[in-house]
């Protein structure tokens, strides 16, 4: 076989504890730091920008993999009224991140595209994940249970038709729509008053 010139492979980077601490602190704030932020951090830590970029890329991949594993190891959902507790998982490695969740992109800052994270990073000292993170896990589980649990909402099983509901809740005097003008903006209300005086 013909082998072309071997591509240069960068040796594995070994981070100092102070470098890892600084990288994790930034990861706690955002999983997607701006290029300028990563450049400042790289020069401060005396690392190449490419090393910092790859570190964040690897942490995001690790986080996604952990999320997938958590979704696969969750117990199958039973009836909607049955509740089960979600146990906290702890990772033995001091370098890994655990229980970080991105906020929806609509909430993120449009200028630097940062996604805010709770402070749930494992520290080398063995600090435990914050209570906010564990409450998020249980909230997301509850939401899944609500969405996947009961397929028929309680009101869907009533014997009444929509027309009957309209008759039941129709109050006398609601045919006059001018009473709804109080809910409009003042500008619209003034326009409506001008139209009625003409």
From Swiss-Prot:
Give this protein's Gene Ontology molecular function annotations: DNA-binding transcription factor activity, RNA polymerase II-specific; RNA polymerase II cis-regulatory region sequence-specific DNA binding
Spell out the Basic and acidic residues composition-biased ranges: 110-119
Give the main location. Answer: nucleus
Xref: Pfam families: Homeodomain
Q: Which top-level group of life is the source organism from?
A: Eukaryota
Tell me the segments the record calls region Disordered: 65-133
Name the SMART domains for this protein. Answer: HOX
Q: Which Gene3D superfamilies match?
A: Homeodomain-like
Q: Which UniProt keywords apply?
A: DNA-binding, Homeobox, Nucleus
Q: Where is this motif: 9aaTAD?
A: 125-136, 153-161, 163-171, 178-186
One GO BP: regulation of transcription by RNA polymerase II
Under the heading SUPFAM superfamilies, the entry gives:
Homeodomain-like
Q: Which compartment or compartments is the protein found in?
A: Nucleus
Site keyed Required for binding to the 5'-TAATCC-3' sequence: positions: 54, 57, 61
Positions of the region LEUTX region? 79-190
Listed under GO cellular component are: chromatin; nucleoplasm; nucleus
| DNA-binding region coordinates | 33-67
- Comment text on domains: The 9aaTAD motif is a conserved putative nine amino acid transactivation motifs in C-terminus of the LEUTX region.
Q: Belongs to which family?
A: Belongs to the paired homeobox family.
| Protein name in UniProt | Paired-like homeodomain transcription factor LEUTX
Please name the gene that encodes this protein.
Answer: LEUTX
